[in-house]
Amino acid sequence: MGAQLRVYRQRIKSTQSMGKLFKAMELIATSRISKARSRVQASLPYANAITRAVSVVASQSEIHHPLTTEPEQILRAAVLVLTSNRGLAGSYSASVLKQAEQLNTLLQADGKEVKTYLVGNKAQAYFQFRNRSFTKAWVNPTDAPEFATAQEISKTLLEDFAEEFEKDGVDEIHVVYTRFKSMVVQEPTVIRLLPLEVSEEEVSESSDLLPLYEYEPEPEAVLDALLPRYIEARIFNVMLQAAASELAARQRAMKSASDNARDLVKKFTRLANTARQAEITQELSEIVAGADSLNAS
């Protein structure tokens, strides 16, 4: 067997093996997406209900709570960045990190100091490779988030938000994540988590669904109880959307890799056939030449 033909056959074999691996990873991601989407949908009723409740209490009671009051001057901002633990998900993590860098630039241009909190190995590796500091990182499974992790993140952010500036506290909290819209569309998104912003539209919708309340205890105590749960619900919903987006991105990336592997196998097969035909032609030519030499002698 010719050297060139042997190389092509080795490439066909290795590409077929990689193609099987990519196909298996595509099927695994596909099977897990439905569960991830179900978890996103299951988290929405509670998240929407507590958002409406907080909006109504904050707007109708006319109180000034630290978590809902805009500070006179914002000197330090916290940014929570959600990426994946593993690769093979296309540009999923890179897109989130790009969005985080843009937000970082905007905040610093406004004269704000930035404290960064990370979720996922990809974000941690990105910052460590560039020798950039971050406050804290969580590397729990990003494609199957747990509520306990959301509670831990919420507690950390709320504690820093409650601290004074001189004690390394923050004045506002932003979250950078990938919003899951559909299997085809996942959008890197930035939201400001705190101070809580209550839009007129939210208040109007909430007023239609929730009556005016008489508060016992005082509205401040109600908000003290509701707001931590609101933050936990928002962060958990964000983590679930990021997980669904990660799996969708990985499914697309593995499908593309599987298709490319199949195309490469076809290409190498054609090249191997061409090389084999050339080898056979050369052998026939040598046989004919040898026969002619014998006849001539």
UniProtKB/Swiss-Prot annotation:
Its main location: membrane. The keyword rRNA-binding does not apply. Keywords: ATP synthesis, Cell membrane, CF(1), Hydrogen ion transport, Ion transport, Membrane, Transport. InterPro entries: ATP_synth_F1_ATPase_gsu, ATP_synth_F1_gsu, ATP_synth_F1_gsu_CS. One of its GO terms (molecular function) is ATP binding. Pfam families: ATP-synt. Gene3D superfamilies: 3.40.1380.10, ATP synthase, gamma subunit, helix hairpin domain. It is found in: Cell membrane. GO terms for biological process: proton motive force-driven plasma membrane ATP synthesis. Produces ATP from ADP in the presence of a proton gradient across the membrane. The gamma chain is believed to be important in regulating ATPase activity and the flow of protons through the CF(0) complex. PANTHER family: ATP SYNTHASE GAMMA CHAIN, ATP SYNTHASE SUBUNIT GAMMA, MITOCHONDRIAL. This is ATP synthase gamma chain. It comes from Renibacterium salmoninarum (strain ATCC 33209 / DSM 20767 / JCM 11484 / NBRC 15589 / NCIMB 2235).
